[in-house]
């Protein structure tokens, strides 16, 4: 699996249980090499979430926002670049992240991101994550795969 190898090459050690929990998100578009990502969620509770996001060269996560839910303002997230280059776009403004740099995205803020030519690894730290509620600007995008 690409993500497990990339994480280990970056010095991020995984247990066998964690390796088995790596998720692949193609956003329902079946163009994973271009649009998609792989992720490992370490913890996702009512209070916090921590995950690793792995992107291949040039791979993109589509534009979206994290809306309010259950009395919360929505997910606030901090992206910390661990490896490669991340082109983060927040409300249309580019925020390039190199290894060791981070950026916090407020709840409800439109954003998308793309890996540089060597791929990228992002550590995400956030409030509770409810991916199934994400709102994408492209109506054909689905965060949770629907099997018909």
Please report, for each region that a protein language model flagged, where it lies by residue:
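A short, N-terminal "cap"/entry segment at the start of jelly-roll beta-barrel domains
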Residues: 1-52, 147-148
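Short beta-strand His + acidic residue motifs that chelate non-heme Fe in jelly-roll/DSBH
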Residues: 62-63, 88-89, 105, 111-116, ...
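Glycine- and acidic-residue-biased ligand/ion/polar-headgroup-sensing regions
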Residues: 48, 56-57, 74-91
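Short acidic-glycine-tyrosine-enriched beta hairpin
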Residues: 78-80, 90-111
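Conserved short histidine dyad/triad with adjacent acidic residue
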Residues: 34-38, 52-72
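Double-stranded beta-helix
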Residues: 116-148
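Short, surface-exposed beta-strand-loop junctions and turns on beta-sheet-rich folds
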Residues: 69-70, 95, 128-130
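A short, polar/proline- and glycine-enriched secondary-structure boundary/capping micro-motif
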Residues: 61-64, 73-75, 124, 133-136
């Amino acid at each position: 699996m690409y993500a497990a190898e990339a994480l280990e090459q970056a010095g991020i050690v995984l247990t066998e249980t964690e390796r088995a929990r790596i998720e692949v998100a193609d956003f329902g578009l079946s163009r994973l090499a271009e649009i998609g990502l792989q992720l490992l969620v370490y913890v996702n509770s009512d209070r916090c979430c921590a995950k690793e996001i792995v992107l291949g060269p040039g791979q993109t996560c589509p534009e979206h926002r994290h809306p309010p839910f259950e009395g919360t303002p929505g997910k606030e997230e901090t992206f910390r670049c661990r490896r490669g280059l991340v082109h983060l776009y927040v409300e249309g403004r580019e925020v390039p992240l190199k290894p060791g740099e981070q950026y916090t995205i407020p709840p409800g803020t439109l954003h998308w991101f793309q890996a540089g030519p060597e791929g990228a690894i992002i550590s995400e730290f956030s409030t509770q994550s409810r991916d199934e509620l994400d709102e994408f600007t492209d109506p054909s995008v689905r965060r949770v795969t629907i099997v018909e």
